[in-house]
Protein backbone atom coordinates (compact mmCIF):
# COMPACT_ATOMS: atom_id res chain seq x y z
CA UNK A 1 0.00 0.00 0.00
CA UNK A 2 2.83 2.37 0.88
CA UNK A 3 4.49 1.63 -2.49
CA UNK A 4 1.25 2.54 -4.34
CA UNK A 5 1.06 5.90 -2.55
CA UNK A 6 4.69 6.62 -3.43
CA UNK A 7 4.04 5.76 -7.10
CA UNK A 8 0.92 7.92 -7.14
CA UNK A 9 2.81 10.83 -5.58
CA UNK A 10 5.67 10.42 -8.07
CA UNK A 11 3.21 10.46 -11.01
CA UNK A 12 1.54 13.56 -9.60
CA UNK A 13 4.87 15.39 -9.19
CA UNK A 14 5.95 14.45 -12.75
CA UNK A 15 2.59 15.60 -14.14
CA UNK A 16 2.76 18.87 -12.23
CA UNK A 17 6.32 19.46 -13.43
CA UNK A 18 5.35 18.81 -17.05
CA UNK A 19 2.34 21.14 -16.75
CA UNK A 20 4.44 23.96 -15.31
CA UNK A 21 7.10 23.49 -18.00
CA UNK A 22 4.54 23.40 -20.82
CA UNK A 23 2.61 26.47 -19.68
CA UNK A 24 5.84 28.40 -19.21
CA UNK A 25 6.85 27.59 -22.78
CA UNK A 26 3.48 28.76 -24.10
CA UNK A 27 3.68 32.07 -22.22
CA UNK A 28 7.27 32.60 -23.36
CA UNK A 29 6.26 31.91 -26.96
CA UNK A 30 3.43 34.45 -26.78
CA UNK A 31 5.33 37.12 -24.92
CA UNK A 32 4.83 39.90 -27.47
CA UNK A 33 5.91 42.61 -24.97
CA UNK A 34 9.37 41.02 -24.88
CA UNK A 35 9.78 41.66 -28.62
CA UNK A 36 7.54 44.65 -29.36
CA UNK A 37 6.84 48.06 -27.79
CA UNK A 38 3.18 47.51 -27.00
CA UNK A 39 2.21 51.15 -26.34
CA UNK A 40 3.70 52.57 -29.56
CA UNK A 41 2.59 52.45 -33.18
CA UNK A 42 4.79 52.60 -36.26
CA UNK A 43 3.74 52.75 -39.91
CA UNK A 44 5.74 51.57 -42.91
CA UNK A 45 5.06 51.74 -46.65
CA UNK A 46 6.82 49.65 -49.21
CA UNK A 47 6.78 46.71 -51.58
CA UNK A 48 5.64 43.34 -50.31
CA UNK A 49 8.25 40.74 -51.28
CA UNK A 50 7.11 37.66 -49.37
CA UNK A 51 3.94 36.45 -47.65
CA UNK A 52 4.27 33.43 -45.37
CA UNK A 53 0.72 32.31 -44.56
CA UNK A 54 1.19 29.65 -41.90
CA UNK A 55 0.75 28.61 -38.28
CA UNK A 56 1.55 29.58 -35.61
CA UNK A 57 2.34 33.04 -37.04
CA UNK A 58 2.20 34.42 -40.56
CA UNK A 59 4.78 36.93 -41.77
CA UNK A 60 4.79 39.64 -44.42
CA UNK A 61 8.21 40.82 -45.62
CA UNK A 62 8.31 44.34 -47.01
CA UNK A 63 11.11 46.32 -48.67
CA UNK A 64 10.99 49.85 -47.25
CA UNK A 65 13.07 52.79 -48.45
CA UNK A 66 14.81 54.54 -45.53
CA UNK A 67 13.73 58.20 -45.60
CA UNK A 68 17.13 59.46 -44.47
CA UNK A 69 19.53 57.31 -46.47
CA UNK A 70 17.33 56.13 -49.34
CA UNK A 71 18.56 52.58 -48.78
CA UNK A 72 16.06 49.73 -48.91
CA UNK A 73 15.58 47.68 -45.79
CA UNK A 74 13.68 44.42 -45.43
CA UNK A 75 11.07 44.54 -42.66
CA UNK A 76 9.54 41.45 -41.05
CA UNK A 77 5.92 41.99 -40.08
CA UNK A 78 4.45 39.42 -37.70
CA UNK A 79 0.82 38.54 -38.18
CA UNK A 80 -1.64 35.98 -36.86
CA UNK A 81 -1.51 32.34 -37.83
CA UNK A 82 -3.41 31.04 -40.84
CA UNK A 83 -6.09 29.48 -38.65
CA UNK A 84 -6.59 32.73 -36.67
CA UNK A 85 -6.85 34.76 -39.88
CA UNK A 86 -9.17 32.31 -41.67
CA UNK A 87 -12.20 34.00 -43.15
CA UNK A 88 -10.54 37.38 -43.62
CA UNK A 89 -7.19 36.40 -45.18
CA UNK A 90 -6.03 33.62 -47.50
CA UNK A 91 -2.93 32.84 -49.55
CA UNK A 92 -4.19 34.99 -52.44
CA UNK A 93 -4.81 38.12 -50.32
CA UNK A 94 -1.29 39.45 -50.96
CA UNK A 95 1.19 38.95 -53.76
CA UNK A 96 4.81 40.00 -54.31
CA UNK A 97 4.96 43.49 -55.75
CA UNK A 98 1.92 44.79 -53.86
CA UNK A 99 2.48 48.28 -52.48
CA UNK A 100 1.41 48.13 -48.84
CA UNK A 101 0.95 50.37 -45.83
CA UNK A 102 1.30 48.54 -42.51
CA UNK A 103 0.83 49.85 -38.98
CA UNK A 104 1.60 48.06 -35.77
CA UNK A 105 3.75 47.80 -32.70
CA UNK A 106 7.45 48.35 -33.48
CA UNK A 107 10.17 45.96 -32.41
CA UNK A 108 12.12 46.82 -29.28
CA UNK A 109 15.37 46.83 -31.27
CA UNK A 110 14.97 49.32 -34.15
CA UNK A 111 17.76 47.62 -36.09
CA UNK A 112 15.64 44.45 -36.33
CA UNK A 113 13.09 46.20 -38.59
CA UNK A 114 10.13 44.34 -37.08
CA UNK A 115 6.48 45.20 -36.57
CA UNK A 116 3.62 43.28 -34.98
CA UNK A 117 0.78 44.02 -37.38
CA UNK A 118 -2.36 45.88 -36.37
CA UNK A 119 -3.47 47.00 -39.85
CA UNK A 120 -2.56 46.43 -43.48
CA UNK A 121 -3.72 48.18 -46.62
CA UNK A 122 -2.82 47.31 -50.19
CA UNK A 123 -2.31 50.78 -51.69
CA UNK A 124 -4.35 51.15 -54.90
CA UNK A 125 -5.93 47.79 -54.12
CA UNK A 126 -9.03 46.42 -52.55
CA UNK A 127 -7.55 44.57 -49.58
CA UNK A 128 -7.62 46.08 -46.09
CA UNK A 129 -7.17 44.25 -42.79
CA UNK A 130 -7.44 45.58 -39.25
CA UNK A 131 -7.57 43.57 -36.10
CA UNK A 132 -5.81 41.67 -33.40
CA UNK A 133 -4.57 38.12 -33.32
CA UNK A 134 -3.88 37.42 -29.65
Model features per residue range: what roles?
Residues 3, 11-25:
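Bacterial N-terminal signal peptides
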Residues 27-42:
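Short boundary/loop segments of OB/S1/cold-shock single-stranded nucleic-acid-binding domains
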Residues 107-133:
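OB-fold/S1-family single-stranded nucleic acid-binding modules
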Residues 86-102:
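Short nucleic-acid-contacting surface segments enriched for D/E, G, S/T with interspersed K/R
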Residues 74-90:
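Beta-strand/loop nucleic-acid-binding surfaces
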Residues 43, 70-74:
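Short, mixed charged/polar active-site loops
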Residues 44-48:
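Conserved hydrophobic positions within beta-strands
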Residues 54-65:
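Short aromatic-glycine-enriched beta-strand elements
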Amino acid sequence: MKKQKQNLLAKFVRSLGFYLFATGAVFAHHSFPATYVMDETATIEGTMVQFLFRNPHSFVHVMVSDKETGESQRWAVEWGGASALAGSVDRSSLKPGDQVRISGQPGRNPEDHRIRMQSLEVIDGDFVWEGDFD
